[in-house]
Amino acid sequence: MQLLDLEHLGRERVIGSYLLTGDEPALVDCGPASCLPALRSGLAAVDLDVGHLRHLVLTHIHLDHAGAAGLLVRENPALLVHVSEIGAPHLVDPGRLERSARRLYGVEFDRLWGPLLPVPEENVRVVGERVLGLEAFPTPGHASHHLSYLTSDGSCLSGDAAGVRIPPARYVAPVSPPPDIDVEAWERSLDAIAKRRPDRLCLPHFGVVDDPEDHLERCRSALRTWAERARSGSEAEFVRAAEEEIQAAADAETAGVFQQAGPLSQSYAGLRRYWDKREETAAA
């Protein structure tokens, strides 16, 4: 397995994709269309191109993980895209996903992510308990349709379920954009990962973590802290507190990568929406 740095907007350590080599090369998450030049370069470095890929395995359909899927299939019609049952319809018809993302990112959408193309239904495969020799298991919380994957050698491809950690910093940011953050489900997902006792975590943001037990507890602690701050404080207070923590743990460039991988204002919005939905449910 090899990590490909997708160099989002020309910056390293923001978004990564994992290449599974073998008779049928596969990517776990592909990043957005805006990162396709770096993806091509990463594949070329190991004597591959998009046409060699046979499978794309998705943790979830957020644009920084799956935005290029439609373009890749257009270029390579033999490519099979493996995704959760909930996520599959949004690949086939990404209109709702794109409208939601354009509301969130506004005029920056195209620069950040590039075009979002549909994946033909015949190229989509709904993930069961196993795919390509990987154990697939649900890890909702960051997204309701989120999946993680465990390899036979103990690597957990955890998507965003295990948060964001930009090396060399040890800080873990539970990035939590709208629309369907669920803190309780997320904690159960951390339990599900820990129960499998992985030897390492493979993070799209960013890289391989060799202390998974400590990392997962850091993620859980930060999630609880961030959730409480969003419940009781303003956006400005939330952002300021998280910025101070990140800046204390990272150099200036790495702190900037944290922000690019998961803007803090969006995490506030996602967690605030979570609390608002809970209050609406309680009042009903």
Specify the residue positions occupied by each region the protein language model found:
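Conserved beta-strand hairpin/beta-sheet module of binuclear metal-dependent hydrolase folds
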Residues: 1-46, 50-52, 149-160
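Metal-dependent catalytic neighborhoods of phosphoester/phosphodiester hydrolases
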Residues: 67-76
